[in-house]
Amino acid sequence: MKPWERFLEKYAAFGMAPSVERYVDLFDVDATLLHPGMKSPIGRDQVAQFIERALKRLPAFRFIPIHWNFRGDTIFVEARNSAEVNGKPIAWPSIYRIVLREDRVLHGRAFYDRTEVLAQFDPSRASSGVNAHSRLLDGAVPGGASGSDRDISAELHDRFVKPYAENWKKPDPDRFADFYRPQARMINPGFERPLGTAELPQYYRLLIADTPGLSLRLERWAGSPSLLFCEWTATGQMGGRPKTLSLVDRFTLDGFQAVEGVAYFDRLELLAMADPAAARIGDVSDSSAALPR
């Protein structure tokens, strides 16, 4: 068994029966961890406190890896998370990007939208409409996963990753549709419904108009014939000031084109760029966290 496979086995075991001890054991002595809402990464000495608070605040928490890919020293894991709040079951999707040292986490970062989770502690803050993104892994079964030592990296890079990343350096809205199959769909956090391929050019025109100077820089990626993860740093102007946002895209592929593209980022981080009150909201383990009124 390869180191990343040993890690994934332990990660999945934690998800089935979460405990502070099992979680801490996933981390290297030099590890760092960053979740949405954290001001900066925490070290291994703070990991136990984080997960203890999170498990207390989110009873019956479970974590099921659905899709994954490994490349170099990095594994991406897309997972369905579930818990209970005041006796009510909740679920939300996430992507965890993990740089490994052997079979332990050296640098871990979580990508998900805190909005729906934190709104469970204050129902008046829930989304007014349907959030299609929050339910996208409902009913998903582990095994559509890809573990990715198959050597298609060069062709995948040349036919999809490189040209897609190049288009984000100076975005051409019409070009984005070329990376999708005609009947594909794209989902971002907060979308009430998926967008079809034909709708993508107009969506990106509006996004670029609202965010002057918008561009994305590729940080890491891992892929296989049917699955691709890309981590990005987005930069652009909001309110006349430069802003940055980290995010991950997951693409389901068919012949080097996407049949589904899903973005993972934190909408509260976007809100905090315009609303100082939102910047004070903590991570999901923070019992003082509340959405701004």
Report residues per predicted region:
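Short acidic-aromatic low-complexity motifs
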Residues: 1-26, 142-179
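Soluble or luminal CAZymes and related metallo-dependent hydrolases
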Residues: 3, 46, 156, 199, ...
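A solvent-exposed, acidic/Ser-Thr-rich amphipathic alpha-helical stretch
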Residues: 6, 13, 20-73, 173-226
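Hydrophobic alpha-helical core bundles mediating ligand binding, dimerization, or RNAP-core interactions
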Residues: 8-11, 27, 51, 79-81, ...
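A general structural-boundary detector
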Residues: 10, 34-37, 85, 147, ...
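A beta-strand edge to alpha-helix "cap/lid" segment located at domain peripheries
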Residues: 55-152, 205-293
